[in-house]
UniProtKB/Swiss-Prot annotation:
Example GO BP: ubiquinone biosynthetic process
Annotated family: Belongs to the UbiC family.
Taxonomic classification: Bacteria, Pseudomonadati, Pseudomonadota, Gammaproteobacteria, Enterobacterales
Protein name from the UniProt record: Chorismate pyruvate-lyase
Record keywords: Cytoplasm, Lyase, Pyruvate, Ubiquinone biosynthesis
Species for this entry: Proteus mirabilis (strain HI4320)
Length: 169
């Protein structure tokens, strides 16, 4: 049985292109980071660690707006974690992977445990990103990206917690 999602069910306000223009440049550089967020965090601390919250297969996706970002699958791999810089929680991460993506080498995604997702994804030459949506939830910045790994999709939502360097100007 799964716990309630680490990312609350509070409404997310996704920013329009016009609203993006109002975001501070430093904040926007974090939200639109194209490389590994893990590597970016490592520039601001001595050690980045993962605290797993929950992981396993699910048969349906909530909230529904995530479902619209992925093709239908009978099951999805769900992984929710807290990413810490020097043992301080900086980011909540939620990864959804259609079962069809978990083939060949990419089956390793179900065994990451305390390894940051970025360490796996950004070593792959077959990785591309379809989009980055940015928004706010309960006063926290967040972003959602759909990646293609060997032309197979996965969805990553990241919520930046108050102690995160994204809020430092």
């Amino acid at each position: 049985m799964f716990k309630k999602s680490i990312i609350t069910h509070a409404p997310i306000h996704w920013l329009s292109d016009e609203e993006r223009e109002e975001v501070a440049e430093n904040t926007l550089s974090w939200l639109l980071e194209l490389g590994s967020m893990t590597r970016r965090f490592e520039q601001h601390c001595h050690q980045v660690t993962v605290m797993p919250y929950q992981e396993g297969f699910i048969e349906y996706i909530e909230p529904a707006d995530e479902q619209k970002c992925l093709p239908y699958s009978r099951r999805y791999w769900l992984r929710e974690i807290v990413l810490c810089g020097d043992n301080v929680p900086w980011l909540l991460g939620r990864t959804l992977v259609p079962e069809e993506t978990l083939t060949g080498e990419d089956r390793q995604l179900v065994n990451l445990r305390t390894v940051p997702l970025g360490r796996y994804l950004f070593q792959e030459t077959t990785l591309s990103r379809d989009f980055i949506h940015i928004g706010q939830q309960n006063g926290h910045w967040l972003r959602r990206s759909r990646f293609q790994l060997s032309d197979k999709p996965l969805l990553l939502t990241e919520v930046f917690l108050p102690a995160s360097p994204v809020y430092k100007q």
